[in-house]
From Swiss-Prot:
Gene3D superfamilies: Photosystem II cytochrome b559, alpha subunit. It comes from the Eukaryota. Keywords: Chloroplast, Electron transport, Heme, Iron, Membrane, Metal-binding, Photosynthesis, Photosystem II, Plastid, Thylakoid, Transmembrane, Transmembrane helix, Transport. With its partner (PsbF) binds heme. PSII binds additional chlorophylls, carotenoids and specific lipids. Belongs to the PsbE/PsbF family. GO terms for cellular component: chloroplast thylakoid membrane; photosystem II reaction center. Heterodimer of an alpha subunit and a beta subunit. PSII is composed of 1 copy each of membrane proteins PsbA, PsbB, PsbC, PsbD, PsbE, PsbF, PsbH, PsbI, PsbJ, PsbK, PsbL, PsbM, PsbT, PsbX, PsbY, PsbZ, Psb30/Ycf12, at least 3 peripheral proteins of the oxygen-evolving complex and a large number of cofactors. It forms dimeric complexes. It comes from Tetradesmus obliquus (Green alga). This is Cytochrome b559 subunit alpha. Disulfide bonds: none annotated. The lineage of its organism: Eukaryota, Viridiplantae, Chlorophyta, core chlorophytes, Chlorophyceae. It is found in: Plastid, Chloroplast thylakoid membrane.
Length: 81
């Protein structure tokens, strides 16, 4: 054995070409993927949150709040109609 493994100093990592080659691709790719996820509306579908134009309907102009925790399912069904 050559000895104990030692962590590489962070300054060495930041100044390496390999780090910047990898991260110059992955960081913008993550940013673009997140922007597309939100701008296409897929985030609303995945997490089930209403779109901004679905919070208020013509019939219901007050905030859709669940106030009774024991009948919450019935309230949610009534609010989603």
């Amino acid at each position: 054995m050559a000895g104990k493994p030692v962590e590489r100093p962070f300054s060495d990592i930041l100044t390496s070409i390999r780090y910047w080659v990898i991260h110059s691709i992955t960081i913008p790719a993550l940013f673009i993927a997140g922007w597309l996820f939100v701008s296409t509306g897929l985030a609303y579908d995945v997490f089930g949150s209403p779109r901004p134009n679905e919070y208020f309907t013509e019939d219901r102009q007050d905030a859709p709040l669940v106030t009774d925790r024991f009948n919450a399912l019935e309230q949610v069904k009534k609010l989603s109609q």
